[in-house]
Amino acid sequence: MTPTLLSAFWTYTLITAMTPGPNNILALSSATSHGFRQSTRVLAGMSLGFLIVMLLCAGISFSLAVIDPAAVHLLSWAGAAYIVWLAWKIATSPTKEDGLQAKPISFWASFALQFVNVKIILYGVTALSTFVLPQTQALSWVVGVSVLLAMIGTFGNVCWALAGHLFQRLFRQYGRQLNIVLALLLVYCAVRIFY
C-alpha cells in the first residue's frame, strides 16, 4: 500500500470510527447512565460483534458483484428498525432524577446490534473493497485488516464511553435532555441509512 493510500485508509477509518453512530451513542449513553465499569459488558458485546461483522465483511467484499440488492435493502430496514428501537430505549430510560437505575443494555443486545448496524457494515465493506482488495486478495491481509478495523471501531466506542464517564455528573444533571438528544441522533442515523 502506498503512503498516500495508507494515509487515506487511516483518515477514513479513524473519522468513521469517531463520528456518531449507533455504537458510539450507545456507549456514551451507557457510560453516562451506569459508569464505565458497568458499561464494559456493553462494550464487550459491541467489540465481539464488531469483529465478527468485519470478518463477514471480508467474505462479502469478495462477492459484492453477486450480492442480491434486495438482501442489502432488507438489511438496511432491519438495521433502521433496531436503531429506532435503541433510540426508544434511550429516550424512555430512567434518569437518576427519576429515582430508578435501569440495568445497562446486555452483552447480547449490544452484540446483536452489530449485525444490523449498517454503518459498520458499510465501514468494513468500503475499507476492504477500496483500500485492501485492489492491492491484494491474500486472505491473510484481508483477515488482518478486518481485525484492525474492529480494533479501530472498538477504540471509537471506548472513547465515547470514556466521554460519558468523564462528563457523567453533567450528563446526569441533564439526563432527560441528553437521552432525548441521543435518541434523536439515533433516529437521524436510522434515516440516513436511506437518504
Swiss-Prot record:
GO BP term (any one): cysteine export across plasma membrane
Topology in membrane: Multi-pass membrane protein
Keywords associated with the record: Amino-acid transport, Cell inner membrane, Cell membrane, Membrane, Transmembrane, Transmembrane helix, Transport
Record-level Gene Ontology MF annotations: amino acid transmembrane transporter activity; efflux transmembrane transporter activity
SS bond partners: none
Cellular compartment(s): Cell inner membrane
Spans within the Periplasmic topological domain: 1-7, 68-69, 126-141, 195
Keyword Cell membrane on entry: yes
GO CC annotations, alphabetized: plasma membrane
Record-annotated membrane-spanning stretches: 8-28, 47-67, 70-90, 105-125, 142-162, 177-194
Residues exposed to the Cytoplasmic side: 29-46, 91-104, 163-176
Described purpose of this protein according to its UniProt entry: Exporter of O-acetylserine (OAS) and cysteine.
PANTHER family for this protein: ARGININE EXPORTER PROTEIN ARGO, ARGININE EXPORTER PROTEIN ARGO-RELATED
Homology family: Belongs to the Rht family.
UniProt name for this protein: Cysteine/O-acetylserine efflux protein
Organism from which the protein derives: Escherichia coli (strain K12)
Gene that encodes the chain: eamB
